[in-house]
Amino acid sequence: MELYVEKRYLKIPVKFAGENRRFTLSENGVPVYAFDAAYAPDAPDAEYYADLRDYAGRTVALDAPENFVPVFCDAPAPLAPAQNALRPAVHFTAERGWINDPNGLCFYDGRYHLFYQHNPYGRLWGNMHWGHAVSPDLFHWTHREEALFSDMEGAMFSGSAVVDRENCAGLKRGSETPLLFFYTSAGKRSTQCLAYSTDGGETLVKYGGNPLLPELVGGNRDPKVVFDAERSRWLMALYFEGRNYGIFVSQDLLHWTLLQRFDLPGDDECPDLYPLTADDGRTLWIYSGAHDMYYVGEFDKKGLYQPIQAVGQLSYSSAAYAAQTYFYEPGKPVIRLAWNRSEIPGAPFNGSMCTPMEMTLRNIGGRYYLCAHPVEGVESLVRNETRRDGETLCDYAQPLRSKACRIAFETKSVPFSCKVYGLDICVETGGVSCGEAFLPRTEEETMQVEILCDTTSTEIYLNGTAITAVPHVQDPEQASFSLHAETPVHFEKFRVAELAL
């Protein structure tokens, strides 16, 4: 059908359990944009919206289901309260649609940018675009326009950002520092591409010289770019296949040469690469994968990455996945976000981001441990905190009046158990268990346990060296926290706080 784009958004009513149908937009006989949606004009579960801003005021051809009736609007309609019932209270979610990996993380001009894998047309994976949001503090987010649209070359898979302050790529226009976004174009071939912004991240333009890297093996993806200041070079971490990863080098961010390939046991896809200075003053490089297996290493005289110890593990569940650090700049905290894979049942949106974490490196008993703690900004969310520091307890209970809460323990005494929103957590001599997840304890005498709960997931941090995210839909009838120990437990720190934005 011919379609005059009279307003920005085209309504797409969808049935969650429906069959996907193909929509293809063409101009002058050439397909330019396509997506799949479970189109259901009768009794849809939710409405989604095709953003056709690039075609406003023009006539295009739309190949759509035979019974499709085009309806335009100026803006998406707000969701009904019932549709938002399970929206996490303090964790990032898309307004609509599925999200997964965090992408293009950077801090620029006082704002944290979060780009993310996004399906604008349903609550399940597909149609990979890059969504976009900005925040002054990593908790209060403002949704921005869809940043990268899938095209006829492929979907927009994961990638990273660079704040190109020295204009190494030569893409600066005007006074703004260019922001560079590396991503995988996933179509018939999987190639590494570049988009850039010269207006502070508001608009992304696909680079005319794409791809930067051709397909080397099928499915190679997820470029993460960082500057190696000591050797004055740019590095790109890339996933190849199986458990095989690599590193490329460049001087101009446009032309890349393979430096090396190696295996990361127990992991696949979504590499991250960044330096950290340990608590003993030694600066080392972290190379990690989507499952949070990680190497601690350094570069040798030939410039090759060499792990200095056996592979480590930070995350002990598959619910916290595909973590990425914000673009590294010396002297600033190393902050990362991970995708929380916990389902949000029945909502027009699905998936969230884990609590933003600050990354550190600690030498414990001669081994380096990658550590993650919630960023300090979580303190600004605390409401109605109960403190029982320095007390000895066997039993404790209190109601919880908010959707989100934080519980923090510090103790040398174990074991004990607790229940939060109906979820059982056991603190034992060897570590912390919750559901199928077990977080092992290091050699440290004191156990520091931090628990962050929201509507559909609970995160647990043990001494920073082991973390997990456990899917758990809150039961409103169990909106409480309780603790029980067979023998008295002395708590150097014991705090229960409700959280809210």
Residue ranges and their predicted role:
Residues 1-34, 49-68, 76-78, 290, ...:
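Beta-rich accessory regions
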Residues 2, 31-51, 69-103, 122-125, ...:
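Surface loop/turn signatures of beta-propeller and other carbohydrate-active proteins
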Residues 12, 62-63, 101-121, 143-147, ...:
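Hydrophobic core segments of beta-strands in well-ordered, beta-rich domains
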Residues 18, 23, 53-55, 65, ...:
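Hydrophobic alpha-helical membrane-insertion signals
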Residues 20-22, 26-29, 93, 109-110, ...:
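Beta-propeller domains
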Residues 21-22, 125-129, 189-194, 243-247, ...:
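Structural motif
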Residues 26, 135, 197-198, 247-250:
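Conserved Ser/Thr-centered positions that define the repeating blades of beta-propeller domains
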Residues 70-81, 185, 190-194, 198, ...:
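An acidic-aromatic loop/edge-strand motif
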